[in-house]
From Swiss-Prot:
The keyword Metal-binding does not apply. Its main location: plastid. It comes from Populus alba (White poplar). Part of the 50S ribosomal subunit. Keywords: Chloroplast, Plastid, Ribonucleoprotein, Ribosomal protein. This is Large ribosomal subunit protein uL16c. Belongs to the universal ribosomal protein uL16 family.
Amino acid sequence: MLSPKRTRFRKQHRGRMKGISSRGNRICFGRYALQALEPAWITSRQIEAGRRAMTRNVRRGGKIWVRIFPDKPVTLRPSETRMGSGKGSPEYWVAVVKPGRMIYEMGGVAENIAKKAISIAASKMPIRTQFIILR
């Protein structure tokens, strides 16, 4: 699963997901892409599940690019813990995704294969997405 090698600070604020994605909203590497239509946190497990599903579906040939990276730590407190005594410890990593952001890209395969593989990956995502073709 994806996670940063090291970060400057161990814990982060939750933040807000306002507006649309200004970066990573165009197809850069492949010919087909999966684009987010809603804002969300996508965990490293979800990213990996989608990537594996796509890889398994295209088998040999074809290349997949993951355009998002989970660089935000999410902290959780132990269950049945009283209030206070600081922020919880980092448990998992998420990528902050805004509408318009490309999540995966794919190239080197036929359109019908790409559409099938990307739709399987889309079902692993917690948000509505759309399939995009570079014309």
